[in-house]
């Protein structure tokens, strides 16, 4: 963020590539600590491996756990965005004249934002569940149903409906809904909504379990020093569930960020700045085609949303492996639009693929490829001793894509970080490393 303020980079974002085990997550955690020190709010909206939980707890932040048997997330809860509407309405009552008219327009825009997020979320989740397209008229019925539900007075902006409420309202099928759906009888209406109702019910208790079957257990608190949504409890092989939860996490996180900005714009809160982290992008990108376009939207608008954005993956092969040519081109565009690119150890062929987007001098290329080599195969007789790969913690920062020299850096862990094990992602192997030699 400070480099963006000084005009060193065009937008506050970074794309990080490096082979596994060389310290990408450690680098990002240290950068996020810098954000906390400056008063910014890091948000990890979908921590797939639980690597940011310890950091978030140590800085006094908020950790939200989601997964089978670990909390629920309401897709119709647009983050904190809906909860600001009553605050804005209360402030509107104190205004008059032209000022009141301008505020009315702000209120209307906010309500439409909430509504739009709700329709988009439900439509996206239904599409993921079906692994297919949601018809335009199905989205229309969802939209009309949600407007009617709020008009009844049963629900408020800070007390949104849940999926079961939406299902019940669609099945009841009021006159307006039936007219919009061109249904002239009960039989026609049932035929019209059968597939949609089945898909919505599957979200309540299908592959995703009960994750979406209720109100949001723990809403995101943008006043926290940091926020981590831990989704590591989700089965690592369940791509559809992972994709559905990730989309919901992003919607909640960015809805909360928008809510914070709305209050600041209205003079009802201080301006806050946020740092969003999309780690393990290779898992996210491969989970579903729709996620690529969602990330693309974020990378294009992060400057206007007061947001620093960090995208982390292994190599560009992760993006080349996407199922469609459109997705592959969109994903490679992330590198082109990033304010800076940070590379850890990468093989020669990977640097060749990046040549069209980044320029490396021969010395830089030699340095980066040398970091990709593993530790020499030397056994130690000292219990607990481990050989360290030569490239661990070493990175090249490229703040410009015009051939300007990069900045080689090395991450150094301070005693406090080591004491609290903020960066230890090998805890499962802790006993193994201290057992000494093993006969095979």
Name each model feature, range by range.
Residues 1, 344-347, 352-440:
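Phosphate-binding and hydrolysis-coupling loops of NTP-dependent motor/remodeling domains
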Residues 14, 43, 227:
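Conserved beta-strand position immediately N-terminal to the Walker
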Residues 63-65, 226-228, 341-343:
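Conserved beta-strand scaffold positions in the cores of enzyme catalytic domains, especially
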Residues 75-78, 85-86, 155, 238-242, ...:
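Short conserved micro-motifs at the rims of enzyme active sites and ligand-binding pockets
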């Amino acid at each position: 963020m400070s480099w963006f303020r000084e005009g060193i980079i065009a937008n506050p974002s970074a794309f990080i590539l490096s082979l596994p085990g060389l310290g990408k997550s450690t680098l990002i955690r240290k950068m996020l600590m810098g954000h906390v020190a400056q008063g910014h709010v890091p948000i990890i909206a979908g921590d797939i491996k639980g690597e940011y939980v310890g950091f978030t707890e140590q800085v006094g932040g908020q950790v939200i756990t989601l997964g089978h048997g670990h909390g629920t997330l309401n897709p119709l809860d647009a983050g904190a965005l809906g909860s600001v509407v009553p605050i804005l309405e209360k402030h509107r009552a104190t205004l008059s004249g032209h000022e009141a008219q301008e505020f009315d327009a702000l209120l209307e825009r906010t309500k439409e934002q909430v509504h739009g997020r709700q329709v988009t979320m439900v439509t996206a989740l239904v599409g993921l569940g079906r692994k297919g397209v949601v018809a335009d008229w199905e989205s229309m019925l969802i939209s009309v149903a949600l407007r009617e539900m709020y008009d009844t007075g049963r629900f408020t902006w800070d007390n949104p409906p849940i999926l079961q409420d939406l299902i019940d309202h669609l099945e009841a099928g009021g006159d307006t809904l039936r007219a919009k759906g061109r249904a002239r009888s009960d039989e026609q209406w049932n035929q019209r909504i059968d597939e949609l109702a089945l898909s919505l019910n599957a979200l309540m208790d299908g592959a995703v379990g009960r994750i979406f079957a209720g109100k949001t257990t723990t809403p995101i608190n943008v006043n926290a020093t940091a926020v981590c949504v831990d989704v590591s409890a989700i089965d690592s092989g369940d791509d559809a569930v992972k994709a559905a939860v990730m989309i919901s996490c992003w919607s909640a996180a960015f809805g909360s960020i928008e809510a914070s900005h709305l209050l600041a714009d209205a003079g009802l809160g201080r301006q806050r700045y946020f740092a969003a982290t999309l780690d393990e992008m290779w898992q996210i990108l491969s989970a579903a085609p729709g996620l690529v376009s969602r990330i693309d939207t974020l990378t294009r608008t992060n400057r206007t949303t007061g947001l620093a954005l960090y995208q982390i993956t292994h190599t560009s092969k992760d993006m080349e492996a996407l199922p469609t040519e459109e997705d592959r081109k969109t994903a490679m565009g992330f590198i082109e639009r990033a304010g800076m690119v940070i590379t850890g150890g990468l093989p020669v062929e990977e640097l060749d693929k990046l040549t069209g987007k980044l320029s490396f001098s021969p010395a830089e290329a030699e340095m980066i490829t040398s970091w990709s080599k593993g530790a020499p195969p030397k056994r130690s007789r000292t219990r607990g001793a481990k050989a360290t790969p030569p490239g661990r913690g070493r990175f090249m920062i490229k703040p410009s894509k015009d051939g300007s020299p990069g900045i080689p850096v090395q991450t150094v862990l301070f005693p406090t970080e080591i004491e609290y094990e903020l960066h230890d992602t090998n805890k499962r192997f802790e006993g193994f490393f201290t057992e000494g030699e093993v006969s095979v």
